[in-house]
């Protein structure tokens, strides 16, 4: 009974625009946020399987360098940081 009340409270917060589930940003209800979070997690896992663990790590390094000033690959080369794209395993 208490769990249903908790879910109702979380759903009310979600309907007000608050993110109540990590990874559920943009969902307009508790259920929508849960589905978004699950899909995003599954999507990341699928990508990791496609390009391999090392490629996934390199992709994260490259993405971490991206900014409003330009893509991560450009910034990495400007700073002299090597990004080894050969680690990307192509399906």
UniProtKB/Swiss-Prot annotation:
Q: Where is this region: Disordered?
A: 1-91
Q: What is this protein called?
A: Em-like protein
Native organism is: Picea glauca
Record's compositionally biased regions (Gly residues): 62-73
Skewed-composition ranges (Basic and acidic residues): 1-18, 31-51, 75-91
What Gene Ontology cellular component terms go with this record?
Answer: cytosol
Q: Which PROSITE patterns match?
A: SMALL_HYDR_PLANT_SEED
* Family statement: Belongs to the small hydrophilic plant seed protein family.
Q: Which GO terms describe its biological process?
A: response to abscisic acid
């Amino acid at each position: 009974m208490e769990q249903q009340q908790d879910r109702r409270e979380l759903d009310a917060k979600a309907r007000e625009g608050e993110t109540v589930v990590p990874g559920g940003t943009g969902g307009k209800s508790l259920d929508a946020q849960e589905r978004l979070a699950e899909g995003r997690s599954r999507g990341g896992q699928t990508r990791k399987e496609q390009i391999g663990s090392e490629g996934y790590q390199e992709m994260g390094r490259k993405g971490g360098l991206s900014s409003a000033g330009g893509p991560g690959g450009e910034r990495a080369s400007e700073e002299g940081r090597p990004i080894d794209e050969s680690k990307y395993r192509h399906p």
